[in-house]
Structures are given as C-alpha cells and as structure tokens.
Amino acid sequence: MRIWGKIMKSNRMLWDMTVTEDSDDTRTHKIFHALEVICHARDLSVPIWLDTNVRDFQQYKKTRFGQDSFVGEQIEFDFLEFQILEE
C-alpha cells in the first residue's frame, strides 16, 4: 500500500511525502501508521479523524485534515491531505 501525504497552503503544495506500507497489518493499521509517519516527519501531532474525514476517506480514499483536526496545535498551513495511491 502506498499512501501520499501533502501539506497545502493557498492552493500550493508546501511539502509532500509518500509512505509504503508492506506489513502484514490490517488495512486500518497501515493507514493509521502511515499517518503517524507523515506527521512525525513534519513534527506534527497526529490529527483526529472527524466524521467528515472518515466519510471522505471511505468514499474517495482521500481526506483533508484542517485546523479543526489538530487539537491543541496551531498549524501553519491550510490542510494536510492524506490519500491512498495504491493498495
């Protein structure tokens, strides 16, 4: 599974990273681990999954985490987009 995380601000990509998850974990564990890896690389707290994030991810294999998902942390960008590239 390949997962892409990118940080966007004012319709411009500031940073991106691709994570490859080849472990025998469940799909859900791979997704959560990839999000942790991406956030750790940028020294961010791991965002919480709101209902809209879960719904978008289930439907489109992509979601955006905005300021409301980063509890107790002020972010310097508009959103973190998280997307499955290949399963």
Model-derived regions, located:
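Generic structural motif
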Residues: 10, 22, 85-87
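Short, extreme N-terminal segment that most often corresponds to the first beta-strand
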Residues: 1-18
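Acidic, low-complexity intrinsically disordered segments
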Residues: 34-87
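Short, flexible N-terminal segments of the mature chain
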Residues: 13-41
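General helical secondary-structure elements
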Residues: 8, 26, 57-60
